Amino acid sequence: MKKLTFIHQNILKSEAKIQRLHHLIGSTFAKRDDNKQSYESWQSACANFHQNYSALVFHSDNFEGEENLIGLLAHDSANGVYAREFAICFIELRPYYFRFGYLYKRLLRKLKHAPLTQDQLSRYDKIKQAYRQYRQNRINND
């Protein structure tokens, strides 16, 4: 992978924030039945996670959610160009957080038909090859 771009850095920052929020849910869940304050802490952690999740994953200043991002991949607008670069960066990094696998696979499929630049196509092909190898290794190890 080439040097981390601004988009890569934002995805990594979001990944860390999502993991912290998700971890907070788990740590407060274990104590939620202890008393009312613990229950409220757990509720607050859940609410905070759900309120921020979409904005962190999709960088809400650019996309309103998964469907918006997927829809923009085929557009020939400035937003479409940015969406394709965001999607390529996302699958290059393969961030690990709640529901990332669904989005990863969906972007992998949708980018196959998107109008990519030569650089993006080259990066996509490398990712696709690595994914095929990963799947093959999983099948052989089962």
Regions found by a protein language model. Give the residues of each.
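Extended repeat-based scaffolds of very large eukaryotic assembly and lipid-transport proteins
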Residues: 1-142
